């Protein structure tokens, strides 16, 4: 084994040398020598998580630039104060009063100089923006008869008009929040249509950042509102200094941060590599932390635990196979059950995830506070004999679509699709696999012309509340949308989910969520496949690494120790 690893390391060094010869935009040397480089992927990268695709990836950059009203404490349902110092809820559960923090300053950048501190108007603007309608207090941008002589100006205007908030749309936030008003400079009232215990968790998710209303108004006055999403201004521990598209983001310490000042002045977020490329850079000390490493190569770290270490945590995610209920054949429960019994999920975990994931026998990940140890065993686990008996004589030909992009919950989507195809072939089912892009799938769903029987997908949550985990992917309100790819609608499921948010007692909420989960596992609109661990590797000189179940990392706590190797 040692001889094999030495050969691999020799091969790796050759790769490193060849990579160094390739021309590509590079980070200035003085920054890499006087800061920390964090290697991650560029998939789905955006400076505005409000508009990012829901359930795909955690944006570590915006976690450093912006703050939220609340954060989530450890692996619990407890909220910790951020921009909101405290809150109270009315007796009828329909009003939330937020008391905001004083003395918080927005970033001063080449594109914006704030004239005031953070206050209630910023909260009102930020929440109203995702509620949509006419609540944003900004001019409408849907001008259809306006022409622009400058093509770049036209593109910016068109981009600004594409206001979509996938996560908040998926949880129907505009059907939960009736109004948001400032009662004083540091007090905000949120009025709900009905009591909803999940609201504060949603406001603690990665998507619920707080913008500067003053900055947005300035951009609107200049007819340049699109810049709100491309030139960020926040209150976080770091602010943006440079950005090279799909290559790197340079962050510099916010000297006026309201919490303890970050220890490292410069952070480079390298977006330029794939999974194996990140490990190459990591071993070459071109980055001191690498996220989403190639799991098949993680064993290399075990040979040198003096210089490197790995950190992992259970993730709030789920990879699954969805049945398209718009197809009559997929509404046959016996067929769905037999397809589930044909899948060797343990083989997928071993071959694709290299045991950095566990077989998912539930919908709610174990890391959630609502996860129950009393959930019944998954009824439709691998049983190829039963599957073949039920399916062999049906002569089925099924279309399996797979979104052609790597995600936390699915590092090799096409390979998993091929393994599913092979398993189903053993049961006598023919499968045609088709890789599709996310924009193509979105267009097909919009036209209700999606022609798949099965689709491989997954979900990644930004908080530990099952409302933001199960409602987007399984509720009637999201049928025929990008989140609910099964197009399943079950009123009893929705009733369980609604019951869970009408009480503030965690035990009652967990009971309702688990009843909803048991219904899903019986009806089987989706087959759970894997819960994936969040993994990163770090140089032993880097300390203060604390990763959350969502994959986020607070750069402000990172620091170097002085050992030299």
From Swiss-Prot:
InterPro entries: Peptide/Ni-bd, SBP_5, SBP_5_CS, SBP_5_dom. GO terms for molecular function: peptide transmembrane transporter activity. Transmembrane segments: none annotated. Keywords: Peptide transport, Periplasm, Protein transport, Signal, Transport. It comes from the Bacteria. Its main location: periplasm. It is found in: Periplasm. GO terms for biological process: peptide transport; protein transport. GO terms for cellular component: ATP-binding cassette (ABC) transporter complex; outer membrane-bounded periplasmic space. Pfam families: SBP_bac_5 (PF00496). PROSITE patterns: SBP_BACTERIAL_5. Residues 1-23 form the signal peptide. Involved in a peptide intake transport system that plays a role in the resistance to antimicrobial peptides. Belongs to the bacterial solute-binding protein 5 family. PANTHER family: ABC TRANSPORTER PERIPLASMIC-BINDING PROTEIN SAPA-RELATED, PERIPLASMIC BINDING COMPONENT OF ABC TRANSPORTER. This is Peptide transport periplasmic protein SapA. It comes from Haemophilus influenzae (strain ATCC 51907 / DSM 11121 / KW20 / Rd). The gene is sapA.
């Amino acid at each position: 084994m040692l001889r094999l690893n030495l050969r691999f390391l020799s091969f790796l060094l050759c790769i490193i040398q060849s990579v160094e010869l390739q021309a590509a935009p590079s980070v200035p040397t003085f920054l890499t020598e006087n800061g920390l480089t964090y290697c991650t992927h560029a998939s789905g990268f955006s400076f505005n998580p409000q508009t990012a695709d829901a359930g795909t990836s955690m944006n570590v950059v915006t976690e450093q630039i912006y703050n939220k009203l609340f954060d989530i404490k450890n692996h619990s349902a407890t909220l910790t104060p951020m921009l909101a110092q405290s809150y109270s809820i009315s007796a009828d559960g329909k009003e939330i009063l937020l008391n905001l923090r004083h003395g918080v300053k927005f970033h001063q950048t080449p594109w914006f100089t704030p004239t005031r501190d953070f206050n209630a108007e910023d909260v009102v603007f930020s929440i109203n923006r995702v509620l949509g309608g006419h609540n944003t207090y900004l001019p409408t941008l849907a001008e259809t008869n306006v022409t622009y002589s400058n093509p770049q100006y036209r593109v910016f205007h068109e981009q600004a008009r594409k206001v979509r908030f996938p996560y908040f749309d998926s949880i129907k936030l505009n059907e939960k929040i009736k109004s948001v008003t400032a009662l004083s400079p540091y007090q905000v009232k949120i009025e709900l249509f009905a009591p909803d215990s999940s609201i504060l968790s949603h406001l603690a998710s990665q998507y619920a950042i707080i913008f500067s209303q003053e900055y947005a108004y300035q951009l609107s006055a200049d007819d340049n509102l699109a810049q709100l999403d491309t030139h960020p201004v926040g209150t976080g521990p770091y602010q943006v200094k440079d950005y090279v598209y799909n290559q790197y983001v340079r962050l510099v310490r916010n000297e006026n941060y309201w919490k303890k000042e970050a220890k490292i002045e410069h952070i480079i977020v390298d977006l330029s590599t794939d999974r194996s490329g990140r490990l190459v850079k990591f071993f070459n000390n071109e980055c001191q932390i690498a996220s989403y490493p190639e799991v098949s190569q993680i064993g290399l770290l075990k040979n040198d635990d003096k210089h490197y270490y790995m950190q992992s945590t259970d993730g709030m995610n789920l990879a699954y196979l969805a049945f398209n209920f718009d197809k009559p054949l997929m509404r046959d429960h016996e067929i769905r059950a037999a397809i589930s019994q044909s899948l060797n999920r343990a083989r997928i975990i071993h071959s694709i995830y290299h045991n950095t994931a566990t077989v998912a026998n539930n919908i709610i990940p174990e890391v959630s506070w609502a996860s129950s140890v009393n959930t019944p065993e998954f009824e439709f686990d691998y049983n190829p004999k039963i599957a073949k008996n039920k399916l062999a004589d049906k002569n089925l030909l099924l279309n399996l679509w797979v979104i052609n992009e790597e995600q936390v919950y699915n590092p090799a989507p096409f390979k998993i699709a091929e393994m599913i195809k092979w398993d189903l072939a053993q049961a006598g089912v023919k499968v045609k696999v088709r890789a599709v892009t996310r924009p193509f799938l979105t267009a097909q769903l919009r036209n209700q012309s999606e022609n798949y029987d099965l689709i491989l997908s997954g979900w990644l949550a930004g908080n530990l509340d099952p409302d933001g985990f199960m409602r987007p992917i399984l509720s009637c309100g999201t049928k025929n949308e990008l989140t609910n790819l099964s197009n399943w609608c079950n009123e009893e499921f929705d009733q369980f989910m609604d019951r869970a948010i009408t009480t503030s007692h965690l035990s009652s909420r967990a009971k309702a969520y688990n009843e909803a989960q048991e219904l899903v596992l019986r009806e089987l609109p989706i087959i759970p496949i894997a819960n994936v661990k969040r993994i990163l590797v770090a140089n032993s000189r880097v300390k203060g690494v604390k990763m959350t179940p969502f994959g986020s990392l607070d750069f402000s706590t990172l620091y170097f120790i002085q050992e030299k190797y």
